[in-house]
């Protein structure tokens, strides 16, 4: 399935139904009086976070969503029915913005969370509503009020516990494939990864979600390469795993390049706990490895892990370090994976793989009864 993390959609809630002008007509009742009912309220437009989705690709093919109008009022004081609602199903982690792309309407971070982004118009009053002591037979009614019509943006930020960052070909996708059942595209050329990938890793019986994003290069915050937009998918993570390839001629510079892009992106990414690892150590000799380890340690101010996703060297230690930070960030308790956890096992490491309203599902029945 193709990945799409941003979509522009046009929504319109239903217009309210018109009130009815009607008079009671029965045998032997000469002056029955008005009995026109009120019009029904127009349908609402909702967005709802559901599991099982990790892309907004469906909104590439359908961008217009319109709720139905309320039914008009009828005689005998019969009110019109409410128009049918429209619900946009989106992945957990989707943010809804106004047309300016800056004003946040809501952030759907839990399964079943719903938000009303456009309220239906109220139905008009029937002529029975206007009956008074001075006007016993009003012959007018109100039209229904129009619904809301606007453009909104959907922006997906994947929910994961740990995020992988680094230059292109730093071994991020290989790492993800080695410790989870994710199967990202892996090749020996830059920008093999063009969209984020998720996988569930297990270490010592505990699970957490890893997010792999496309590589960053110098100037990514200015649009160089494929830019830095995908960094939004690691904003929600508890920890970043920064991979630097041992094949880089200057590993210290490679580390600082990515660090600079994280700072330029902002949103407190540089404030997150960071684990630094020198990857692909199986392709360099021992003397070169020692030299690059010292250089990277000077650049990042800490001792980097040494790992190889091919031989499995150092992988368990890195996973445990990630797990420990995630557990600590969640109050010291075991973390339940933010996505539905899959039962996975490691590959053999020794082998060579405000108009709106929000609600949860638990509140939905109460709201419908009140409506």
Curated annotation (Swiss-Prot):
PANTHER family recorded: DEVELOPMENTALLY REGULATED GTP-BINDING PROTEIN-RELATED, MITOCHONDRIAL RIBOSOME-ASSOCIATED GTPASE 2
Pfam families reported in the protein's UniProt record: GTP1_OBG, MMR_HSR1
Sites where the protein binds GTP: 166-173, 191-195, 212-215, 279-282, 308-310
Region (Disordered), start-end ranges: 337-371
Molecular function via GO: GTP binding; GTPase activity; magnesium ion binding
Cellular localisation: Cytoplasm
Quaternary context: Monomer.
Protein's UniProt name: GTPase Obg
Gene it is expressed from: obg
Principal location listed in the UniProt entry: cytoplasm
GO cellular component assignments: cytoplasm
Domain Obg: 1-159
Cofactor needs: Mg(2+)
Hydrolase listed as a keyword: yes
Function of the molecule: An essential GTPase which binds GTP, GDP and possibly (p)ppGpp with moderate affinity, with high nucleotide exchange rates and a fairly low GTP hydrolysis rate. Plays a role in control of the cell cycle, stress response, ribosome biogenesis and in those bacteria that undergo differentiation, in morphogenesis control.
């Amino acid at each position: 399935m193709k990945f799409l993390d941003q979509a522009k959609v046009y929504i319109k809630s239903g217009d309210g139904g018109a009130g009815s002008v009607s008079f009671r007509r029965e045998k032997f009742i000469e002056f029955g009086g008005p009995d026109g009912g009120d019009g029904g309220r127009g349908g609402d437009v909702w967005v709802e976070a559901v599991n099982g989705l990790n892309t907004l690709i469906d909104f590439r093919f359908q961008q217009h969503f319109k709720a139905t109008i309320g039914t008009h009022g009828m005689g005998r004081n019969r009110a019109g029915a409410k128009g049918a609602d429209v619900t946009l199903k989106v992945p957990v982690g989707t943010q809804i913005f106004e047309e300016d792309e800056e004003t946040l309407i809501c952030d759907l971070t839990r399964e079943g969370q719903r938000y009303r982004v456009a309220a239906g118009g109220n139905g008009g009053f029937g002529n029975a509503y206007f009956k008074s002591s001075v006007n016993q037979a009003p012959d007018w009614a109100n039209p229904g009020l129009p619904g809301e019509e606007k453009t909104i943006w959907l922006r997906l930020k994947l929910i994961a516990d740990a995020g992988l960052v680094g230059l292109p070909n730093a071994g991020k996708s290989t790492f993800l494939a080695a410790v989870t059942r994710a199967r990202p595209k892996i090749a020996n050329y830059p920008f093999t990864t063009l969209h984020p990938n998720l996988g569930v890793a297990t270490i010592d019986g505990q699970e957490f979600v890893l997010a792999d994003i496309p590589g960053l290069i110098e100037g990514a915050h200015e649009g160089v390469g494929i830019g830095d937009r995908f960094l939004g998918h690691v904003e929600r993570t508890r920890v970043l795993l920064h991979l630097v390839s041992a094949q880089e001629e200057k590993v210290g510079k490679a580390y600082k390049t990515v660090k600079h892009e994280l700072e330029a992106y902002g949103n407190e990414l540089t404030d997150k706990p960071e684990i630094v690892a020198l990857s692909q150590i199986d392709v360099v000799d021992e003397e070169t490895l020692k030299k690059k380890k010292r250089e990277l340690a000077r650049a990042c101010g800490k001792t980097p892990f040494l790992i190889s996703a091919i031989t499995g060297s150092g992988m368990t230690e890195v996973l445990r370090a990630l797990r420990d930070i995630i557990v600590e960030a969640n109050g010291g308790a075991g973390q339940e994976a933010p996505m539905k956890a899959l039962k996975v096992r490691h590959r053999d490491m020794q082998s060579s793989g405000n108009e709106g309203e929000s609600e949860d599902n638990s509140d939905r029945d109460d709201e419908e009864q009140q409506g």
